[in-house]
Amino acid sequence: MTNLFKNIFIFVLSLFLLFSVSILIVLWTFSNSIPDYRFLKSYKPPVSSKMYSGNGELVADFSKEKRIFVPYEAIPKNVINSFLSAEDKNFFSHPGVDAKGVMRAIINNIQNIMSSKRLEGASTITQQVAKNFLLTNEVSFNRKIKEAILAFRIERSLSKERILELYLNQIYLGSGAYGVAAASL
């Protein structure tokens, strides 16, 4: 009986070590091709140039995108809470990737594939910032790994408030509007 437990323990330990080494190899491999994220600390999105008449009326708006930068402190709490509720309920408690969210999405997507329903994502707001600022929209496992690595690094480098500020000023909200302020006009 003791040999059985010993063999099971060795088997489980071997699986754990194999899994750990595999993860380290994947992380090391992808870390070499990760874009530099440090510019996000001081990033300000491009805003439109506006021309006003002598009496203060807007004459022209020169831009391809409608965009108005709003600092985190000026974004209404209801707007922040709405996005957190819809996009990333655990934003303030995860380290960039929400393990529970990933597991939920895997389970739900297996069920959705079986019933021909739409697949759901598990990207956190930080992962969306990584994708929108640093990666392409390519749908691939490689991009998701890079996105996760970047999310962990961004979370170590920036405050949660700064990450939300970037997200809420960069997200496309339709009709050419980028960011919550431009979308509110």
Task: Describe each region flagged by the PLM.
Residues M1-L185:
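Juxtamembrane regions of bacterial inner-membrane/periplasmic proteins
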